């Protein structure tokens, strides 16, 4: 009997493999082919282009165990996680797919056979739903499978519009769609809930375990449903739900995976009660966070990284709630890898960087908590009334990671009410912003769709005859264009490389007698290559034969930069470690940009070693060899793949000696020696855990070196030396500058001491306390602290407020002697003054600083200080 989650996963894939399905690896959680998705959230995502007819595979049946995330965007389960039996941010979707192969009867039979024969689920515990008008599905279930009519439930348009139904699936407002049938499991009458379609259907008794979608229509913009020429099937079964059934439990959080993670989290934090909901949250969130980082997402303040950061902080908050006093979340990664089995292969390979990224985010969260307490204290001190507004509460939560319930606890101690409704409004607005982050809601159907194929000859030639098969003007198909028209021209065959894998599209010309079309870019449109540009002369029509000519110089320079990215990737892995993987690239004729995973800045010595290693491989003049092979064979040979790229079962492998082997469909030099020279121009971080190197090659590298030499010679002339003496002379100048700065600081201290002696006489006495309020002219902000200390020593029991203006800004300092801080706090005092000069600030009870942007209001602000102090000393 299959019981563990790992056993169920293997059994499912083996069942469909034995029934003629290609087992396809789970795709990345970062969708590689769909701009409308924030994260991969269903098994069919990686096959979307196949269903749309824009991609072809060498198989018509497939099966997967797809990793999915639902957090942020349209599909967001985050708020419910930990509080229900079945909501998760991360889950695995088991699925089988037919691309114009089998249809309803086979799909239904496969599902029923796996559940009742392979898993041996009792048939009397199962019932099914179908779309209201899908009589064909009813006949199959009833007559061919043998399900009683009373156990086949018809579901109509229960969402308020035509075809808006739990049992009618639609990819979007237009495009492939169709009815679906769902299989439900009855957990028993001791669990509350009703059959699907009943008023009690939201209960936990009847649980959907398998959804089988029949894609048989193409919905038009008019709403008309046209039959698809090749109907297809998309199915999905959540592994956590079927595991709960097989393991005899009623909550997903009681299955083997979660039991292990919950127990480990409790052990690390020191919790004895394993039923704590916070432990569920932590166990769920470590799965989504770890796998997202493994797939290249890093915590940040925008897009996918923003959602990841929120999930991490939610988990850490629940850990703190349970009493965690130090970073704990990252310590769950080894247990996660162990319990996920084969599904954690990619995670195991990136374990080091995943743990470092999680730990860094946890530690940063701890620092923001401390800052949040300081911000909250200042906000409460400035509060007028008894209610802290929701926007401030949300700012503390969202910007500083400060939990709302902790804010409420602090407020209760001061008899202050928290505006929870305002907080929820601000939270809802931020959720909307997160959904829109990175424009992930773009209309997929807005892309130009071209029903054609173009053969590529550009690996071996840069010019050749071709026939025009289609022309698109302003997004519409036309038969001809005239001079001056900007259009996309499709050919039956082309030497032009279409942008892919970081390499920009080729430029060049399409020419014939009296015709010249300037190609400014080349892009892929499904299986077709689109030549984007302007018709300079003549007229061009579909069916004409032209000569396609790639710009040789631009292609050559691009190839230098592309080939060297392979060498750079291999060199980085040698120097920094095998955790380095490519996260993106840009290769054009002028330069290259290479993004890679690494948890810290690359040291100067490491950069030098990388550069030297690449240039060594260039000098060795390796021949670049390409070969077509199966994806599994390529992986066995150690070929590295590009982050976010999709690969067919047959791939192209590029090898450079024994130094580099990668999957790549781009164009390259013949030998590494053609690159000439490689020079790194910059290295920087672009996100947490992601670094970027920019570099140049060939003639551009020589020009860069020449420019550096010219700048060095110019610097030498300014220092009155030569290139060989620049460093020594510069060091001497810096030493001299440091000495002058030291002397200047000493002089300022003397001036401050002298000024303090003069200022003592300006103090007034209020109820036996020396009070000094002064606007200072010509005093730098950096001198205020020392001056305040001098005055405190001379005035003893005193309250001091000093202000100065410099470059259109106000600088303030307040000092209160220790015997008076029970009555007057420097932080409150300086904040009061700062508010009147367009600024803010705070600090300790005995000393605080602030700034402002309205120097014209400084005199009036200082005039308010004495009454303010007098009131508190009364």
UniProtKB/Swiss-Prot annotation:
Q: Please state the Enzyme Commission number of this protein.
A: 6.1.1.7
Q: Which PROSITE patterns match?
A: AA_TRNA_LIGASE_II_ALA (PS50860)
Needed cofactors: Zn(2+)
Cite a single GO MF annotation. Answer: aminoacyl-tRNA deacylase activity
Substrates-to-products reaction catalysed: tRNA(Ala) + L-alanine + ATP = L-alanyl-tRNA(Ala) + AMP + diphosphate
Give the co-factor note. Binds 1 zinc ion per subunit.
Q: Which residues are connected by disulfide bridges in this protein?
A: none
Gene Ontology CC: one annotated term: cytosol
Q: Where does Zn(2+) bind?
A: 562, 566, 664, 668
Compartments it resides in = Cytoplasm
Q: Which InterPro entries match?
A: aa-tRNA-synth_II/BPL/LPL, Ala-tRNA-lgiase_IIc, Ala-tRNA-ligase_IIc_anticod-bd, Ala-tRNA-synth_IIc_core, Ala-tRNA-synth_IIc_N, Ala-tRNA_ligase, Ala_tRNA_ligase_euk/bac, DHHA1_dom
Principal location class: cytoplasm
Q: What class of enzyme is it?
A: ligase
TM region positions: none
Family, according to the entry, reads as follows: Belongs to the class-II aminoacyl-tRNA synthetase family.
Entry function: Catalyzes the attachment of alanine to tRNA(Ala) in a two-step reaction: alanine is first activated by ATP to form Ala-AMP and then transferred to the acceptor end of tRNA(Ala). Also edits incorrectly charged Ser-tRNA(Ala) and Gly-tRNA(Ala) via its editing domain.
Give the comment on domains.
Answer: Consists of three domains; the N-terminal catalytic domain, the editing domain and the C-terminal C-Ala domain. The editing domain removes incorrectly charged amino acids, while the C-Ala domain, along with tRNA(Ala), serves as a bridge to cooperatively bring together the editing and aminoacylation centers thus stimulating deacylation of misacylated tRNAs.
Q: What is this protein called?
A: Alanine--tRNA ligase
| Organism listed in the record | Shewanella baltica (strain OS185)
Question: Taxonomic lineage of this organism?
Answer: Bacteria, Pseudomonadati, Pseudomonadota, Gammaproteobacteria, Alteromonadales
**What would be the name of the gene that encodes this protein?**
alaS
